Amino acid sequence: MNQEVMNLFNQQAQPVSFDQIKISISSPEKILSWSYGEIKKPETINYRTFKPERDGLFCARIFGPIKDYECLCGKYKRMKYKGVICEKCGVEVTLARVRRDRMGHIELAAPVAHIWFLKSLPSRIGLLLDMALKDLERILYFESYCVIEPGLTPLKERQLLSEEEYLRAQEEYGEDSFTAMIGAEAIRRILQELDLDKIANDLREEIAVTTSELKPKKLLKRLKIIEAFQMSGNKPEWMILTVVPVIPPDLRPLVPLDGGRFATSDLNDLYRRVINRNNRLKRLIELRAPDIIIRNEKRMLQEAVDALFDNGRRGRVITGANKRPLKSLADMLKGKQGRFRQNLLGKRVDYSGRSVIVVGPELKLHQCGLPKKMALELFKPFIYARLDAKGFSATVKQAKKLVEKEKPEVWDILDEVIREHPVMLNRAPTLHRLGIQAFEPKLIEGKAIQLHPLVCAAFNADFDGDQMAVHVPLSLEAQLEARVLMMSTNNILHPANGQPIIVPSQDIVLGLYYLSIVAEGAPGEYKPDNAKNPMQGVYGDMGELEHALAAKAVSLHSKIKWRWTGIGPDGEPLTKTYETTPGRVILSGALPKHAKVPFDVVNKLMTKKEISAMIDTVYRHCGQKESVIFCDRIMALGFNHAFKAGISFGKDDMVVPENKWSIVDTTRALVKDYEQQYNDGLITQGEKYNKVVDAWAKCSDKLAAEMMGRISSVQKDEKGADKQVNSIYMMSHSGARGSPAQMKQLAAMRGLMAKPSGEIIETPIISNFKEGLDVLEYFNSTHGARKGLADTALKTANSGYLTRRLVDVAQDAVIREVDCGTTSGIKMRAIVDAGQVVATLATRILGRATAEDLVAADGTVIVKTGETIEERHLPAINAAGIQEVKIRSVLVCATKSGVCATCYGRDLARGTPVNMGEAVGVIAAQSIGEPGTQLTMRTFHIGGAAQIADSSFIESSFEGTIKIRNRAVAKNTDGDLIATGRNVAVVIVGSDGVERAVHRLQYGAKLRVDEGDKIKRGQRIAEWDPYTRPILTEVDGIVAYEDLVDGQSMTETTDESTGIAKRVVVDWRGSARTSDLKPAMVVVDRDGKALKLPRGSDARYFLPVDAIIGFDPGATVKAGDILARVSTDSAKTRDITGGLPRVAELFEARRPKDAAIIAEKSGTIAFGRDYKNKRRLTLTPHDGSEAVEYLIPKGKHIHLQDGDVVELGDYIVDGNPAPHDILAIKGVEELAAYLVNEIQEVYRLQGVSINDKHIEVIVRQMLQKVEVTDGGDSDILSGDQIDRTELTDYNEKLLAEGKKPIQGVPVLLGITKASLQTKSFISAASFQETTRVLTEAAVNGKVDTLEGLKENVIVGSLIPAGTGSMVADIRSIARRRDAMILQQKQAESGAMPVEELPPAAAE
């Protein structure tokens, strides 16, 4: 009886809360302990009675009843027999739900290897036994025998014997003299007999003594897996299965279809195969069948079990009846349709609906229009409860009837229920957190959801048929979070850059722009010298002005004088007069009254940018509530006046410049000229192409400028008053719709088109859309247009995948503490590109905490260490002329798991310091991923002039005095100053002695300034020829040739058009005769002896292939003259990987194709002996360490000479640097700066602004691992990769014990790799390569402590971020209290000490 009572309690088990999940390999005993019985038959259900067969795959006796509280034969029914086991059919009377969690098992007649541990690379069984996978498979699939016990025979242990060899050995040495086995039994036996401790010790000794390069890596891998088995308590023989678990039947259901057929889960088929083969094998063994038959059956059993676990990993894919591969257990987990991504990370939710959206201009910002029908359905439970409470209905059934009939009282109650109950609206794709926002519903007729126009930008919604989903937050907590955190009024700023996102667009912008136009000569305008009517156009009162407008005494655009009353800085009323227009006065009426928001904010032409700045000003000074009210007001104003203005355009508004054809003809003549030059052989095909494309691009731009000039000019009417501005220009200039590029296509010329490959077609489209295209032009333009459409589709998928990888790598970066107390930081300065300031210092440091005091020149501290730089500090920082600020960054944050608030700085979406528990990683990932679809996909070929123009000179962006560092300059024959060194740098020093800028000069650059010169902004410092790389002489003397033999290493060509002879170095390595020549030019003295260079070597300059020689032998040269030059055509059309592929390349930390070679030490360069087709360079470091050797392919131009001195980090060969090299050579800070700048570069091209800190968060996640260079006194081996935090933990322990700490260097991992290497195996498994991750985790017996967000979503608990971050704290407090109470109780009762108590269950 007692047992039955216990059973009663066992049934309704409460869900257990847990803190961590461990995964390990299950032992046969464990599988049996889960099982409720063995499955002996392959039958599923009886097709006549539809009852499950006994001992079959759906057996009710093993898995539980089909109907709640009813046994199979019907003897026991109802609750009262709960827990009784029917003696007739053996079924326990309980809930049918147990069929979802009761497991069965199959006893295998022969052991079988688990395919994951065998075939998932690297093969765990193979590593453990140190056997090749091929050999293992030969044993397992019964092709070879394996010697287990050689006995006294000459056979070796684990030697493989084929069938013949085995029989021969048996004959030779006798049957019992040795033991050889075959199949999984053999492997199991070997695994059982392994002595892991002994192997581990042997391996450690071997690693210590080995000298080769690759051996330790292999041994390390093996040692790791052996240690994994030792630590995790897994036994190696468990990788061979003797029992196969059978998952609960309701997870592999059999569903009756109409027509008497059944749809079944593939797993049932796979299980049936295993059971059939297993039963057949059992029978064959009983019948003592011949060995060969039994072996074949065992092999088939092995294959059946393989297919069940992972179909298709080995051998043929097992297919079902319709030739479709069967879904195995592994397939159930992996991929987008697998368990992780389909059901655990994203679920469908109830209490939701979706409908089309329409615009709701009369809504307030916090409202949305919800159709009554939808509201009635969504809020049903609330309505039922209310009807019950008010006594309209006694039962739910009655309430249901009332609602279905839509009685009037139901509508009243719906109104009550909805009041202040926010709903969430979501538009797919949800690319960032503003894709879901909360609104208060307002009931409307009709069936479409109404959306406030200002939130469209955040949702990226438009009203051309978009749909949105509505979700109802049910619990009080959910409603609270929706209201406080997700309400649209609380999301005014964009999390990516901190600018307002509730910005008017399109009609609203057009209306406000129209409102703020000024027109000359409009009626009733104010004229200062108006003697007849001096008071005309002077107003001081809003009513008076409105009256004048209504009477048409004055127009919206007339110039008037206006007396404005506002609030002064001291809070007192303040009046001021402004010259303005009535339109602007009306606009100013919407402004909140505040000292920092004067009339000047609206007294300008309101383009979209100005409106955004205005909203920003209002938000920063007046706070959130005022901004929301203000936004609603200007929205109404904008719509109203756009409607009143009635702006529209006709075809005559597209003005074609009348001088169009003359410009086009000029260009045509130019192009003809280039064609002729090409035909005469003066220029190459490539040069001609570049020049032609260039000419047409210039022509197109010139036409566009002409057209813009005509459209934007204001016409006068006969009275001299301004006519209305051109409508198209208004739309484009205000930022409402259309761009100059589109206007150019409408009214100037369509311009150059691209082929699908991205190359530009030489023939442009000269017509515009107003004139119409002819057939050929139309055909040309279809080319690029189709490519555009195809690109868009690809781009979306690519961008989504990038976002997914970013979220995955950054999901556990959460704010965990207020200040980690680190003293380090990173230096920030303005980004200057080709003399243009691209990002000012102020924008980069705003909202970040300082890492050291910011001190002005007079010694006053502007910002103290650890304080955040706010807007109010910026004027002082600019005034102090500070160029570089050291700020805190997440890259240097010392918080163990997560980041600290001080290092992160301001929360951009709120404008306040970041909150505890904010999931900054996910925000960073969304901010970088969301604009992904706006980036381009293709790699550009930038033709001709485009790239050259920006890289041939340096301009100063500061005023100051010039200093020249590493001065290696010489005056050449023309009297110009030439930089003859590789690291000459021009430093601009400000008046206060602070270095303002440092410019490294190109070798051979012509200096326009000298030491001590004063320089102004915009003045040129130096310039160089971008088309050539010069080889300069550094001494004065006479030119001599060495090994320059005409016809062997040099050719002389005469230019036909000019008759000038040109000497070019040709490839002399082609033939054996000439291959040992070393063509060079030597500078000699009068006696023909080579002159010495300052650094001691001869003045001998080796010439690369294709060098054009500049002097004849015997010519006199001065230092700085160009002896020879190499033409750099290659630089002109280098593919620039742009857009998304570039961003992905940087985040994945891939090595670029033509990676630059970077000097890893400062030192001297020497050329060694050439090696095959590579040049050998040796770098002898100045610090006396070992020389470094570089092998460089012959084709690459090395712009260094023998004996040149390079600094650490200089490029030896140009190209894109590999991020790993930057990290290794220049360190973390340089790497971060490089990645941030390169990624920002791509986004800047598209006009997308993202704050640096987001990229820093991702880079921090990429730098989490450290490679151990010296294990110190720990058991960690060098070459291992461990977490940064683990390293510090280990070292703290080691130093405390007075031992030698571990040394390591940071490693950069790409985002995919970093995601797969997170501590949490659940997170990694749900990301990619599920099988591999789970196999590895199981072998290591990994424990997932559920610290990140993803793991918690998967196990279904609250995420430890945001409002959920408190839960962890509360739990730990509760645990401490529990422990204290226990101790008190023990102290009182003198019970056993805490250590021996069973561990407390996690809350």
From Swiss-Prot:
Bilayer-crossing residues are none
Which reactions appear under catalytic activity for this entry? RNA(n) + a ribonucleoside 5'-triphosphate = RNA(n+1) + diphosphate
Keyword DNA-binding among record annotations: no
**Cofactor comment:** Binds 1 Mg(2+) ion per subunit.
Q: Which GO terms describe its molecular function?
A: DNA binding; DNA-directed RNA polymerase activity; magnesium ion binding; zinc ion binding
| This protein's record includes keyword Transcription | yes
Q: Which residues bind Mg(2+)?
A: 462, 464, 466
Could you tell me the EC number(s) of this protein? Answer: 2.7.7.6
Organism's domain of life?
Answer: Bacteria
Q: Quote the NCBIfam families the UniProt record gives.
A: rpoC_TIGR
Q: Which family does it belong to?
A: Belongs to the RNA polymerase beta' chain family.
Assembly description: The RNAP catalytic core consists of 2 alpha, 1 beta, 1 beta' and 1 omega subunit. When a sigma factor is associated with the core the holoenzyme is formed, which can initiate transcription.
PANTHER family cross-referenced by the UniProt entry: DNA-DIRECTED RNA POLYMERASE, DNA-DIRECTED RNA POLYMERASE SUBUNIT BETA
What is the name listed in the Swiss-Prot or TrEMBL entry for this protein? DNA-directed RNA polymerase subunit beta'
Q: Which gene encodes it?
A: rpoC
